[in-house]
Amino acid sequence: MFKDRENKRFIKIFKEGSLTESIQILLDTETGVNYIHLNAGYGISLTPLLDSDGKVVVSSEREIQNYIDRN
């Protein structure tokens, strides 16, 4: 359904885990906000990624373009 879209709003910039448990960092290419996506069994969580000061991690336009170029 969404794989045919040329300009994806969310791109995966990190993934680690196994078949049943995983952690991913997703980047919203429109806002620059980074999200952490946890998947464990039947449970799923999606929340903004926070830095050490508790502020939302926002990628710069340059970082976003670098990630888009890699994918």
Question: What kind of feature is each model-predicted range?
Answer:
Residues F2-I23, T29-E30, H37-N71:
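Motif-centric detector for short Cys/His coordination patterns
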